[in-house]
């Protein structure tokens, strides 16, 4: 805070000493005749003024203010600035345009000013303010920006010392936690013979003395009766060596808890036997669904996640000596009009797993009738409460009891997870995948403009409730939480915002909350592997791929014939929507002669016939694709496939393009993570991807791929053209970037690492929730009221 005040003090003193220059700057900004200015617009205007009239401004204290300014709002008298001097730290200032008087203001005052400008009316007398700050004053929070997203490490450090103090006073919460574990009728860990911490220490010593003389590979079953007499039940390990190691970890914790020992010990406790994963919207299935509206990376993510989690759960249970089959159920929507998919089947086993399945429950209208057709993710809010109630009943029957962990996905799944977890009293994990608020400019401030199509008033309210209800939140990248030095994170954008006429958020989500953890996913290693791994290649698919890419015949699901098939291929695959920016890529390609000469463009996206799409935005993008291909005569250089590729075929397609020394491009305006980026890199395909979102962290620019700025398409096209030129002229360059991508994925982005971390996190948060009362009951009551008075009426109104 002192640094922030020093920053403002220096600027104030500069203004006083250089009033003409300061007035020139403010006049220049106000002359743009814009009530709201984005960071990029402010920086561009400042640079333009410095270059043209005021070079002395470049190194002035005002430059420091401008460089950390995220947005500005102004009327004829005042300019209000939102400053972000460092990551997740905000300061609000207003400056009078004539007198140059400046002062620090509150977040509420800043938001109120924006509301007045947006609504074009005078200030409302009373506005509902959403403020969770009073509920978190005494709760542990991170302070350093580099600690954000490492919540469990922070919790372990802070709370392990607290646990040590409480154990010294005879506290029994750790003991009670160890005694509470059961699997149906099977008692685990400790029995009634151990009554207090003193008994626990004594029993651990006796058991260790007994086990010391036993063969280290002797199984749990062979020593069970002896250990039971000391007070121990199954769950300590599958053989003597592991049992002793687990007991030693607990003895160390009882002696002096350390964060690492605590994490190692908790990661072994048999707490997670069943999972519920919630993903209501879209066509959730295993075949013929990818590329359909609202159906893409999230489905792939969850199916790969399930296979990795089930394997990790099975391995951990076996290591702890328990012959228990874990259960994972994905709860999604049943769609009677399934369009040839399995989405009309109530139960569907998940391929590649032992005991995971998809459970589908229909949406119903207020009269109880089943909704038969697909519904956009933006239109499903009226159905979620009833879906949560019916889904909970079906889930409990399917699992023969409560799940041990519930994982929500996207805004709808996270809201349903919140409703269920509160009723069932189980640990809740949220995964956003994408937060719509940051995708659409001023989507909060001008929410009425988008309400008919997107219903953001419901979605942003659901996000606020679910974020603050969750026990822990996992993200794929740091910037998903807290952005970069230059821009705010997706979650950070929910810390303060306003929806005029509804409510004003002055303290929404706090990115310094230890509930945030970065756990990056990977690509399915059975499907996405290096093109150079010849023994595993699916060569029987190559004729089908060659036909898809090069066949001269045209069908209803493809357009364009590549007249120079020997050229390398620039490949992209994504949904056909505005944010994915497929048509933007086509325009870049069309306008870059060098790129067109060096490479063909292959696009797998959407439908060729717009009449086949049920999504208005997709139809609009399809029509634009046809217009661009006609306008720029691209049919000989661009191949557009409106097909849905199964995973095995998609994996081999990546490798086929790598064989031909091609590249992959992900041109999205914003990408929360970038699963296709991981898939391409895992296949050894050099990758270009947007600098907005997850790919900025995934790719090391120039080493394991390349960043492109989708707002500067000409530069992006030039970069891709330069790459293909360099590959043609410099031996080994293509292989250098290809290997860099493979190395990066192996080091950071695998499902094995993901599953290990996810299972450890679920245990640690479950433990701290039990022993430290992390339920935040006061906050939950506040959120329940907000749900009942704000979300519920608006959702119900949609159904009328």
List each language-model region with its residue ranges:
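Catalytic cores of nucleotide-sugar-dependent glycosyltransferases that transfer UDP/GDP/TDP-activated
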Residues: 1-800
